[in-house]
UniProtKB/Swiss-Prot annotation:
This is HTH-type transcriptional regulator Rv3575c. It comes from Mycobacterium tuberculosis (strain ATCC 25618 / H37Rv). PANTHER family: LACI-RELATED TRANSCRIPTIONAL REPRESSOR, TRANSCRIPTIONAL REGULATORY PROTEIN. Overexpression of the gene in M.smegmatis impairs the utilization of cholesterol as the sole carbon source by M.smegmatis, activates the host's innate immune response and triggers cell apoptosis. Coiled coil: none annotated. One of its GO terms (biological process) is regulation of DNA-templated transcription. Residues 11-30 bind DNA. Keywords: DNA-binding, Repressor, Transcription, Transcription regulation. Residues 9-64 form the HTH lacI-type domain. One of its GO terms (molecular function) is DNA-binding transcription factor activity. Pfam families: Peripla_BP_3.
Length: 359
């Protein structure tokens, strides 16, 4: 006759074994600061002996209606979180705030490789207590799905005019206006601007006037307007700006865009870029084609990522790590007033070695 199998240990049986309350056992796993070190150690040692792994997280979630995690929504492939330096720093900042406040972090990728149905299901199925939405367009369909969840939401960068939602970002227009003013002050009059995508449709080409009037990504629109304003202030026709859009955010995207810009206007003496990854790629392309930076071409970026700074790129540095940290804090520790908060973080113009007077 086989021996009677031992019943699985439960929170109740562990409490009975130790002659303590169920709350004491629960606190040993979930709120250790509520117990003395000796008592917690005794609870954990007995739990190990009886084979009790801890409170069921699913049951706890159902009971407390808390998932204990933050959802980070980004309209990019998952690999973008780790390959783009600015995005990587941002994610690290969110993770830092989650760790400090005892929360988990769930990455919710709704990039273009997913169908609308799959992306919607990912947002609806995310077991989280709130969302940080990173840099999506005005017309992003998943933003509406996030809002339908009726959970706390913090938007980062864009969209900039979402009513009733807290946002963390920078003054993109002012930062780009200062950078463009610096380039124009060096004497440049034939400017090219390499931008990240302006809309959800796939384009990798020169940007016409109609598209420039109606981009759905606020950050890119504001940076373009910043360049226009600097050109106007310097007495340069803004319509002379050569703009090339890159849909894909790949290590080669800036080089491809630089080629298009120079073919469209061989008189260009400066290539401004709305991201450092575009600028670094453009510099690689120029070097491969015998165009010296900055002697023959000025190149500027935006973000201030470590590789850009190490290569002496003239750029705008923004606090991506701090931006992520503040977004997480605002979500997990919202103001007592319950009112949305708009935080505009400082940027810094970095005068590197890639900008000089036109040849």
């Amino acid at each position: 006759m086989s021996p009677t199998p031992r019943r699985r240990a439960t929170l109740a049986s562990l409490a009975a074994e130790l002659k303590v309350s169920r709350t004491t056992v629960s606190n040993a796993f979930n709120r250790p600061d509520q117990l003395s070190a000796d008592l917690r150690e005794r609870v954990l040692a007995t739990a190990k002996r009886l084979g009790y792994a801890g409170p069921d997280p699913v049951a706890r979630s159902l009971r407390t209606r808390k998932a204990g995690a933050v959802g980070l929504v980004m309209a990019e492939p998952l690999t973008y979180f780790f390959s783009d330096p600015a995005a990587r720093d941002f994610v690290a900042g969110v993770a830092q705030s989650c760790e400090e406040l005892g929360q988990g972090l769930q990455l919710v990728s709704v990039g273009s490789s997913r169908s609308l149905a799959d992306g919607t299901a990912a947002v609806l199925g995310a077991g989280v207590d709130g969302f940080v939405v990173y840099s999506v367009g005005d017309d992003d369909p998943y933003l509406q799905v996030v809002l339908q969840r009726r959970l706390p939401v913090v938007v980062v960068d864009q969209p900039k005019d979402l009513s009733g939602v807290s946002r963390v970002g920078i003054d993109d227009r002012a930062a780009m206006r200062e950078l463009a003013g610096y380039v124009l002050g060096l004497g440049h009059r034939e400017l090219g601007l390499l931008t990240m995508r302006l809309g959800r449709d796939r384009r990798q080409d020169l940007v016409d006037a109609e598209r420039l009037r109606s981009p759905t990504f606020d950050v890119q629109r504001e940076r373009i307007v910043g360049v226009w304003e600097a050109m106007t202030a310097a007495g340069v026709d803004p319509d002379s700006l050569t703009v090339v859009e890159s849909y894909e955010h790949l290590p080669t995207s800036g080089g491809t865009a630089a080629k298009v810009a120079l073919q469209a206007n061989p008189r260009l003496t400066a290539l401004m870029c709305t991201a450092d990854i575009l600028a670094l790629s453009a510099m690689d392309y120029l070097r491969a084609h015998g165009i010296y930076v900055p002697g023959q071409m000025t190149v500027t970026g935006f973000d201030g990522v470590p590789e850009a700074l190490s290569r002496g790129l003239t750029t705008v540095a923004q606090p991506s790590l701090h931006k992520g940290h503040r977004a997480g804090e605002l979500l997990l520790k919202p103001p007592r007033s319950g009112l949305p908060v708009i935080e505009v973080l400082d940027t810094e113009l970095v005068r590197g070695r890639t900008a000089g007077p036109p040849a």
